[in-house]
Amino acid sequence: MALAEADLPNGKTNGKASGSEETPAPVQKVDMNVAINELRVGCKVHVEKDGEDRVAEILSVQMRRGNLEFYVHYVEFNKRLDERIAATRVDLSQGVIWPEPEKPKKPLSGAAKESSKEKKKNPSKKQKLTDSAATTPGANSEDVMDLDNLQVNGTTQDPDNFNRDEEIEKLRTGGSMTQSSHEVARVRNLQRIVLGNHVIEPWYFSPYPIELTEEDEIYICDFTLCYFGSKKQFERFRSKSTLRHPPGNEIYRDEAVSFFEIDGRKQRTWCRNLCLLSKLFLDHKTLYYDVDPFLFYCMTRRDEKGHHLVGYFSKEKESAEGYNVACILTLPQYQRHGYGRLLIDFSYALSKAEGKTGSPEKPLSDLGLLSYRAYWADTIIELLMEKGKQEMTIEDIASVTAMTTTDVLHTLQTYNMLKYYKGQHIICLTDSVCEKYEKMLKKRRRKVNSELLKWKPPVFTAAQLRFAW
């Protein structure tokens, strides 16, 4: 029998101290009497999407050619599905949920005020870099760590100043699945891009010059990655440009693809253009204009016109965490053709040539995580199923594949291949694993031929690795 509050000893409630009951979450009221021109940013409305009714949050309101348009994010759906819609698709008969009023800002404490004054007097290098790039949204001031004013004397937060609501607010994420992002970065700013023979609809915001955002489509050269607002400008540029491949060293070539290595310091403009292009399809990465610390490995397809970019991954020249990939992308028009897997395979081929193990930088995008998990599983299962590989430890697998032991262990646990037998853990090839291997043999997957790799690990001096050398 359940106990009522009066039945509990010492006047205590069931699981809660008296007088400390949690405040119930506010109920969002639906306003049924709203005109279409009264809608503003933050409102949640019902929208027709592919013949179905969806709840969407308005991120932007704009008049385009005399017509009212809304840029919306569909609640509980991936941000890449955000789109600009006409006012006619909004169903006001089901009501509108207004945005919650902004919370009043709390006054800063004495210590916080002093720290804020010091930051204004001595801005860090990173803040100066961010301020100089006007078109590039940076992190909020609260999220930027000022190394010059960082306290390392072991001070801790006073428990009396702990605020439960503030701590919960830090953990919340919005439709972009990122914390403390600028509102402008939530709205996709380009409608379409023309890249070679492909017309592509971007997925996310990228800080291209603001004058380009007013165009219905922009033109991007698939060799130089330069961008133009009009077709005439683009055609004039192409008639004069002679570049027909990424501006780096070709380190790999087979019958299908080539790989080029580009140094971010030596080809700043090209690499910055590559970052702008990739940001249109990556939401989880922060874009900075400092490309000097990175090497870019670009995969291309060849035809009579030249080498066309398929995808790329970047890699830090010196990674303290042992990452072999910083950012990886296959362009949308080439996805689901095995090129993403080939990029991953090439990154591990470089790690093998270096004699190191490596892992991609976290966090990965949703598509990137799926690709890596599939690659890890197929590579490990194929290795274990080979004849003569009767006994292998996790360290042996990591050494052969150039994967970290953490990634190997995670993959073995995911496929239930770790068993406890006679006082020790063993790797067991289950029936499902064997079936997966049989299916894998039937698929014709592209692989990197290490014999065709013409590359030696680059060596950099301490001066070359320094900021802005």
Curated annotation (Swiss-Prot):
InterPro entries: Acyl_CoA_acyltransferase, Chromo-like_dom_sf, HAT_MYST-type, MYST_HAT, Tudor-knot, WH-like_DNA-bd_sf, Zf-MYST. One of its GO terms (cellular component) is NuA4 histone acetyltransferase complex. Residues 118-127 have a biased composition (Basic residues). It catalyses: L-lysyl-[histone] + acetyl-CoA = N(6)-acetyl-L-lysyl-[histone] + CoA + H(+); L-lysyl-[protein] + acetyl-CoA = N(6)-acetyl-L-lysyl-[protein] + CoA + H(+); 2-hydroxyisobutanoyl-CoA + L-lysyl-[protein] = N(6)-(2-hydroxyisobutanoyl)-L-lysyl-[protein] + CoA + H(+); (2E)-butenoyl-CoA + L-lysyl-[protein] = N(6)-(2E)-butenoyl-L-lysyl-[protein] + CoA + H(+). Residues 39-92 form the Tudor-knot domain. Residues 185-457 form the MYST-type HAT domain. The active site is at 361 (proton donor/acceptor). Its EC number is 2.3.1.48, 2.3.1.-. One of its GO terms (biological process) is DNA repair-dependent chromatin remodeling. The modification N6-acetyllysine is found at residue 285. CDD domains: NAT_SF. The record marks 327 as: Important for catalytic activity. Component of the NuA4 histone acetyltransferase complex. This is Histone acetyltransferase ESA1. The gene is ESA1.
